Amino acid sequence: MNMRTYTNITYEKNRDIIQLMHILSNPNTSIEIYRNTFYKLGKALGALLDEKKHSRYGNTMLACASEDADWLAQGVLSSISQKNVALAVFWNQRITLDETTKLEYSPIVKSYIEPIEECQTLIVVKSIISSSCVVKTQLTRLVEKMNPLNIYILSPVMYKDAQKNLQKEFPESISNKFEFLTFAIDTSKDAQGSVLPGVGGM
């Protein structure tokens, strides 16, 4: 049985966001609607972040994978009150090291990173956080170059163990800065390791 728990939203106040989540998990959703749905969810995540930050960001960088740059990340950028944001975009390759345990490695094969001085807020945006390997690789690259005061990890959907597993990959001096913002926690995966209902098989 595929179990999903909604967080940061309620059926009474956020039916529009829940409807967007249903659209994402529908395998018959068209590409155009799928992309537009990610943009709208990005805007909603950005609005949630603004509530947390009270518009006090300081020097800010947004990091994302290349496949999330045009839709989800753009939605976040359009919604947050901080408009001067440095960008970091990564192209990752996913390599499965162990088929049995679904252990994965995600090396960066290309990156675009804008300069930033004294980063205070690092925002990492991902369409879904499952094994955390992509986010881990991106964060490792960035925290080596800078020492942000706050790290916000935004994703519409997260697998139930993703937060714990990502935190274990970093020393407490880094992981204590993490704050995760999501709308749904999923508890199931299929035989291929895809989160269910997830975001349509991604």
Where are these regions (language model features)?
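PRPP-associated nucleotide enzymes
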Residues: 1-202
